[in-house]
Amino acid sequence: LNRPDTVLWLAKTYVVPAGMYGSQIWGTQYLKQSRQFDSLVQTCHLSFLKGVLGTKRSAPNWAVFRECGHEPLRFYWFRAAVKLYNGMRASNSELLRKVVRADCAFMYRAHHCWTAELLTALQELEHGQAHCDAVKSGEELHLSLCCADLRKQNRSVWDAVDGLNPREHAEKLVSYHN
């Protein structure tokens, strides 16, 4: 295929779901903004996108996502983790609800348990404290608010370089944005 738009659409349809497989469980360690590009799956996704665009490996990740119309996999992983939490919390299985409560209690002793990693990532969002309070009290997380916070956080990358003169700043992202 020599049509990048078709390849990118196929990637969004098939590659992104494959990259999400089981991410509700293993992906929580990559939900923090500072770790979103640490995952091998995300690295492969970016390499694929850069290959489709024909750019160098050194091209800024955010510019590649913007050019391709893709989100970082972290966005999808975050959404999947919130849906899993809400589903387990509201499950009609008493055992599953007990597991969620036990993991919530365990987070104070083990910083790498599922709930602790989710809370660490939630804290970074604009309404992070409200999200964390909801989890700690066993309430539902509002998926639409979490997604809006994530998108705003992703846009902040561009807000930081908005209006900067590319001749005065050496970052590639500044040159791409302006």
Task: Please annotate each region the language model reported.
Residues 1-107:
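Non-catalytic, peripheral interaction segments enriched in hydrophobic/basic residues
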Residues 25-32, 88-178:
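Charged boundary/loop elements
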